[in-house]
């Protein structure tokens, strides 16, 4: 099972925990990415500290890159094995797969 950094409460860096998270098959219009790189952005500190609060528990991070592992129905122009990157919400990019 893939792992991700998750927070269950706002606070200092110590509230971030490395946990296993279920990742299902992509739904229509979605892809599954085996992430190899994540971007660190100051908004992640805002989410973690509570300046921009999230519902808990929640993943953090807004950008990542990796290889496409699976493609949902209706996706065009992206195939399994393609290298991709994104910088968009919802938060949760601090993860091995998404």
Residue locations for each model-derived region?
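A short glycine-rich beta-alpha junction/loop motif
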Residues: 95-98
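Short beta-strand or tight-loop elements
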Residues: 14-19, 64
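Short N-terminal binding/cap micro-motifs at the start of the first secondary-structure element
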Residues: 12-16, 42-43
């Amino acid at each position: 099972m893939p792992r991700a950094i998750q927070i269950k409460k706002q606070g200092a860096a110590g509230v971030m925990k490395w946990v296993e998270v279920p990742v299902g098959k992509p739904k229509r219009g979605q892809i599954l990415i085996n992430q190899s790189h994540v971007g660190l952005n100051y908004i992640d500190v805002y989410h973690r500290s509570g300046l921009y609060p999230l519902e808990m528990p929640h993943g953090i991070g807004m950008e990542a890159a990796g290889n496409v592992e699976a493609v949902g129905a209706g996706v065009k122009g992206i195939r399994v094995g393609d290298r991709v990157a994104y910088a968009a919400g919802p938060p949760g990019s601090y993860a091995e797969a998404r």
